């Protein structure tokens, strides 16, 4: 049984909801799944005034626990076409793991959210992949066998790089069932590959 960590950052709950779907898909594929988040960097008073979701039940992860998993599925909102600074800050603390090769051969996968259809979903995921490749991780995306990413009947996220959701400029749009289904598929797909690699 593969051990999968779903590690995310979510300001307003969109990525949190996607993380839950990713985790459900991995569990359904037989994996032992843990959901954790990275620490918030925004001062609490500022976060509250901005309406950020501070009551997320997922515990905060530590860098030292990452090698305990066969696969890590990362979730982040987009910030100008890149991952959020909270996730970047967490990953920038993994130098010791890089030096010792602790993540080499682990499966890495990414899902994301943007405000708009063309707000940087794909660049966020592919730029995230650079860090995972430096760690020697095996990148897994969202293959076209998950045909929901080709749905043209509604506005939807999703690409071969990973599941995504669109939050709308004011954050009022929640992940659609189509997007959540892709997230579940990605979780299951990663879990199956991780189980094969773990032997």
From Swiss-Prot:
Q: How is the cofactor bound?
A: Binds 1 FMN per monomer.
Q: Which residues bind NAD(+)?
A: 12
Q: Can you name this protein?
A: NAD(P)H dehydrogenase (quinone)
- Known Gene3D superfamilies for this protein? 3.40.50.360
E.C. numbers: 1.6.5.2
Q: Where is the signal peptide?
A: none
* Alphabetized InterPro entries for the sequence: Flavodoxin/NO_synth, Flavoprotein-like_sf, Flavoprotein_WrbA-like, FMN_Rdtase-like_dom, NQO
> Which keywords annotate this record?
Flavoprotein, FMN, NAD, NADP, Nucleotide-binding, Oxidoreductase
Catalysis: reaction(s): a quinone + NADH + H(+) = a quinol + NAD(+); a quinone + NADPH + H(+) = a quinol + NADP(+)
Flavoprotein: present as a keyword of the record? Answer: yes
SUPFAM superfamilies in alphabetical order: Flavoproteins
Q: Which family does it belong to?
A: Belongs to the WrbA family.
Q: What class of enzyme is it?
A: oxidoreductase
List the cysteine pairs that form cystine. Answer: none
| GO terms for MF | flavin adenine dinucleotide binding; FMN binding; NAD binding; NADH:ubiquinone reductase (non-electrogenic) activity; NADP binding; NADPH dehydrogenase (quinone) activity
Where substrate binds, per the record, is at 98
Show where the Flavodoxin-like domain sits. 4-190
Q: Pfam families annotated for this entry?
A: FMN_red
Residues at which FMN binds: 10-15, 78-80, 113-119, 134
Q: Which cofactor does it need?
A: FMN
């Amino acid at each position: 049984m593969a051990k999968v960590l779903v590690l995310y950052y979510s300001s307003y709950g969109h990525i949190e909801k996607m993380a839950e779907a990713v985790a459900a898909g991995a569990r359904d594929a037989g994996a032992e799944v843990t959901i954790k988040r990275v620490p918030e960097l925004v001062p609490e008073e500022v976060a509250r005034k901005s309406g950020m979701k501070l009551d997320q039940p997922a515990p905060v992860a530590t860098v030292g626990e990452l090698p305990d998993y066969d696969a890590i599925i990362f979730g982040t909102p987009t910030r100008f076409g890149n991952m959020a600074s909270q996730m970047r800050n967490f990953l920038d603390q993994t130098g010791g793991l890089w030096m010792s090769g602790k993540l080499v051969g682990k499966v890495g996968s990414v899902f994301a959210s943007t405000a708009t259809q063309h707000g940087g979903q794909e660049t966020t995921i592919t730029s995230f992949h650079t860090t995972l490749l430096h760690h020697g991780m095996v990148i897994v995306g969202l293959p076209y066998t998950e045909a929901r990413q080709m749905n043209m009947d509604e506005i939807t996220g999703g690409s071969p790089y990973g599941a995504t959701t669109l939050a709308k400029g004011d954050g009022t749009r929640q992940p659609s069932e189509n997007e959540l289904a892709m997230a579940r598929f990605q979780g299951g797909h990663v879990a199956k590959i991780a189980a094969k690699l773990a032997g």
